[in-house]
Amino acid sequence: MGRPRRRGRDINGVLLLDKPLGLSSNDVLQKVKRLFSANRAGHTGALDPLATGMLPICLGEATKFSQFLLDSDKRYRVVARLGQRTDTSDAEGALISEREVNVTQAQMDAALDSFRGSSQQVPSMYSALKHQGKPLYEYARQGIEVEREARSITVYELLFIRWEGNDLELEIHCSKGTYIRTIIDDLGELLGCGAHVSYLRRLQVATYPSDRMVTLEQLTAIVETAQAEERSPNAELDALLLPMDSAVLNFPEVNLLPAVAAYVKQGQPVHVAGTPGEGMVRITEGEERNFIGIGTIAEDGRVAPKRLVVEHVDGANPVVAGVAAGNTP
């Protein structure tokens, strides 16, 4: 019997992809997975095909921590087309109303100010939120309206950039779960003229730097050049990745001596002096501060592992951040 076929290589890290216009987040995810020959990949919050910009893609063990990027703040640049409302609240939808734009700067300023801070937002029917296991947009395409509960959101910053003709450009820093299309649709109705999103770009996720974004074209060029030169592109591709723990840098660090870390790697909680009183922590090991996973502070003050990094070595058993599976510290 032959050896089972490998699905891909074990590569761990976070790629900041600059998602192109016209492709879905899953489309670009699959392209990145193939280019890296990765065995596992997942994105951290979908962007509509109409949208471009930062889409963090987690490879390998980094997928264990992708949820924390889903829960992080986002920053967007958006252009709203005033005077036209569509059924999807963006340029891809059908026009459902067209009205004149008779809005003063004072009225605009007052309307924008009403969106700053915390509020309740009813998600769009054209969203990926699920109802009975099916995305809302599938119901919407069938002409079915589903009752949606309002959700708490926070707009930390809403910057007025420009207003030329019927195009209004804004920059919005917001909490997780905020639908920019819904903000623009609500703004249009508040102004009495209607509006939809004509341009949307995600500038930032959490604290990731925008200058570390790479495009599909750059990745493809690296692979094609390597193939033409009959060499592996892996080293060049891997240099573009950010560390796995970049997804959880907002958690306090608990640094363990190797002897103590060995217990954590086996799933055992440990007492560590000087830990936070509660909440999630990022666990590192030794003077090198190697990331081994995340944990929580238990009621008795011990650090309890929650998700640990598993390293894969060709021809060997999986290793939990340096300890072979099954070993006892």
From Swiss-Prot:
Gene Ontology terms: biological process: mRNA pseudouridine synthesis; tRNA pseudouridine synthesis
Keywords, ordered alphabetically: Isomerase, tRNA processing
Annotated catalytic residues: D48
InterPro entries hit by this protein: PsdUridine_synth_cat_dom_sf, PsdUridine_synth_N, PUA-like_sf, PUA_sf, tRNA_psdUridine_synth_TruB, tRNA_sdUridine_synth_fam1_C, TruB_C
GO molecular function: RNA binding; tRNA pseudouridine(55) synthase activity
Catalytic activity: uridine(55) in tRNA = pseudouridine(55) in tRNA
Enzyme class: isomerase
Record keyword tRNA processing present: yes
Highest taxon, organism lineage: Bacteria
Residues binding substrate, per UniProt: H43, Y76, Y179, L200
Primary role: Responsible for synthesis of pseudouridine from uracil-55 in the psi GC loop of transfer RNAs.
Family to which this protein belongs: Belongs to the pseudouridine synthase TruB family. Type 1 subfamily.
NCBIfam families: TruB
Protein name: tRNA pseudouridine synthase B
Organism for this UniProt entry: Yersinia enterocolitica serotype O:8 / biotype 1B (strain NCTC 13174 / 8081)
Organism classification: Bacteria, Pseudomonadati, Pseudomonadota, Gammaproteobacteria, Enterobacterales
